[in-house]
């Protein structure tokens, strides 16, 4: 029998319904795995007591035939989802001891469906990063190793703790947030399915903000079916979020295994990527195109002429919004306060923020403050907003001809911890392929599609039309079936 912590969400639900095991046993297996792999630093706060209580309640519901859709299923939450009475820090010193008195809508939705929370996962500070190396709790180590090297690898970011938890069988699923690729890129690096829904599909209420016009809750799972199950539970209109979309939550599970006949898949002729793409990524992309052709899809050449400006646009708009959102952390209302005798209010602000924020967060606040200044507004911010509109228009034009778009998720496989740290611009290019869809607010997923020559997982990205999560899952499921001969599992696990 498969170890309980290695079961997918779908198989766990089936086993619990058949009474093959209890939720208490399932949760116990995951707790044991978490304790065994503390060195990966995936979790920053455990909620084992809560999880065991929730599991006990789930077992009672199964006994009484009152089980909900996620009854007894273990999940983890990125540490920017506020959890009532449970520490929520965004992995920043400025919020290191913050305990919210309210629950985020997304975690509440999962609790309402019977989900069991194992804990809060590590992340880049305030979700700013691509390698999970800016957390005040230390970096996360990927469960994966290259087959020619034993060096520790990054899990991707900013949702690296969630990716490591699911990839390392320390959770069946895990919540992340995706602003410019923070679910999709870690999913690619760790051999997982990572899904970012349409902007507004999942409520942002109770999510600690980075860039409000881009932030969206996402999910990590080990199968496309699991992704559809979790998305159905997470999504839905929320009057507490002004950007929430008033649309029915679709039935998504029927997308799994659907025919690709008459599906048109767009492949961009160029994104101006040059030599940044590793050869392994190019081969995986071409192999996936052939896979979809053989499955009955029609491949259509498309152009996204403004996508090449995506990274530049993102690193104007996102820091601008961050500088505004993070201005609330001033040492007065909540979070860290640094003070000394005879200190003025301005000095207290300065000391608190300079002590509480890490270097990358301070860098982005400064960039954002500048582009919103009188000298930067016209030169940078307003121009970036105009180009953002052009990027969205490019997608609209493409989707007049195709049902989905296929791109690599990241230009490289996972890299060693410590690499690319000295030059922020090199790190920013990790999001080269994920940012354009974020700027347009589109649903997209990364699904494992191959292994590099060094044995590391490579993800392919599927981008769909607004509110068309169904077709994204349909294409992802076809790719998953086509590469089922590849085992996307870290060797030591």
Curated annotation (Swiss-Prot):
Gene name of this polypeptide: gatA
User: Mind telling me which InterPro entries this protein's record contains?
Assistant: Amidase, Amidase_CS, Amidase_dom, AS_sf, GatA
**GO BP, one annotated term:** translation
Q: How does it assemble?
A: Heterotrimer of A, B and C subunits.
Q: Name one GO molecular function term.
A: ATP binding
The UniProt family comment states: Belongs to the amidase family. GatA subfamily.
Q: Domain of life, per the record? A: Bacteria
- Cite the entry's keywords alphabetically: ATP-binding, Ligase, Nucleotide-binding, Protein biosynthesis
Tell me its EC number(s), please. 6.3.5.7
Q: What class of enzyme is it?
A: ligase
**What is the protein's name according to its record?**
Glutamyl-tRNA(Gln) amidotransferase subunit A
| Pfam families, sorted | Amidase
What reaction does this enzyme carry out catalytically? L-glutamyl-tRNA(Gln) + L-glutamine + ATP + H2O = L-glutaminyl-tRNA(Gln) + L-glutamate + ADP + phosphate + H(+)
Entry-linked Gene3D superfamilies: Amidase signature (AS) domain
Naturally occurring in which organism (per UniProt): Rickettsia africae (strain ESF-5)
Q: What does this protein do?
A: Allows the formation of correctly charged Gln-tRNA(Gln) through the transamidation of misacylated Glu-tRNA(Gln) in organisms which lack glutaminyl-tRNA synthetase. The reaction takes place in the presence of glutamine and ATP through an activated gamma-phospho-Glu-tRNA(Gln).
Cellular component per GO, a single term: glutamyl-tRNA(Gln) amidotransferase complex
In this protein, the active site sits at 78 (charge relay system), 158 (charge relay system), 182 (acyl-ester intermediate)
């Amino acid at each position: 029998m498969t170890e309980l912590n290695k079961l997918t969400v779908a198989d766990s639900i089936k086993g619990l319904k058949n009474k093959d095991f209890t939720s208490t046993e399932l949760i116990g297996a995951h707790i044991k795995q978490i304790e065994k792999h503390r060195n990966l630093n995936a979790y920053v706060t455990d909620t084992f007591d809560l999880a065991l209580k929730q599991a006990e309640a789930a077992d009672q519901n199964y006994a009484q035939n009152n089980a909900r859709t996620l009854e007894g299923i273990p999940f983890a939450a990125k540490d920017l989802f506020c959890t009532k009475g449970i520490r929520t820090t965004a992995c920043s010193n400025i919020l290191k001891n913050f305990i919210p008195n309210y629950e985020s809508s997304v975690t509440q939705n999962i609790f309402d469906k019977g989900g069991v929370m194992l804990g809060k996962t590590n992340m880049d500070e305030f979700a700013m990063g691509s390698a999970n190396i800016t957390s005040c709790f230390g970096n996360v180590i990927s469960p994966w190793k290259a087959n020619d090297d034993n060096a520790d690898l990054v899990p991707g970011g900013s949702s690296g703790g969630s990716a490591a938890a699911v990839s390392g069988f320390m959770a069946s699923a895990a919540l992340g947030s995706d602003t410019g690729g923070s679910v999709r890129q870690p999913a690619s690096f760790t051999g997982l399915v990572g899904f970012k829904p349409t902007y507004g599909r999942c409520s942002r209420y109770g999510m600690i903000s980075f860039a409000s016009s881009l932030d969206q809750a996402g999910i990590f799972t080990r199968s496309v079916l699991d992704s559809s199950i979790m998305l159905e539970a997470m999504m839905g209109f929320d009057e507490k979020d002004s950007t929430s979309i008033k649309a029915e939550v679709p039935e998504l599970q029927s997308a799994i295994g659907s025919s690709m006949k008459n599906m048109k898949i767009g492949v961009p002729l160029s994104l101006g990527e040059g030599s940044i793409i590793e050869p392994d990524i190019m081969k995986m992309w071409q192999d996936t195109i052939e896979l979809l052709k053989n499955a009955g899809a029609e491949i259509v050449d498309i152009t996204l002429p403004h996508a090449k400006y995506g990274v530049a646009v993102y690193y104007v708009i996102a820091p601008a919004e961050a500088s505004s959102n993070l201005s609330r952390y001033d040492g007065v209302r909540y979070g860290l306060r640094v003070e000394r005798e005879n200190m003025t209010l301005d000095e207290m602000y300065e000391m608190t923020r300079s002590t509480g924020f890490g270097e990358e967060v301070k860098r982005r606040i400064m960039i954002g403050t500048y582009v919103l200044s009188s000298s930067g507004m016209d030169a940078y911010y307003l121009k970036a907003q105009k180009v953002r509109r052009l990027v969205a228009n490019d997608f609209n034009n493409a989707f007049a001809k195709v049902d989905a778009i296929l791109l690599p998720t990241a230009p490289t496989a996972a890299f060693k911890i410590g690499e690319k740290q000295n030059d922020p611009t090199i790190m920013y290019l990790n999001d080269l392929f994920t940012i354009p869809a974020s700027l347009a607010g589109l649903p997209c997923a990364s699904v494992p599609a191959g292994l590099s020559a060094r044995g590391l997982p490579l993800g392919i990205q599927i981008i769909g039309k607004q509110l068309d999560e169904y077709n994204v899952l349909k294409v992802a499921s076809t790719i998953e079936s086509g590469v089922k001969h590849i085992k996307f599992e870290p060797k030591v696990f």
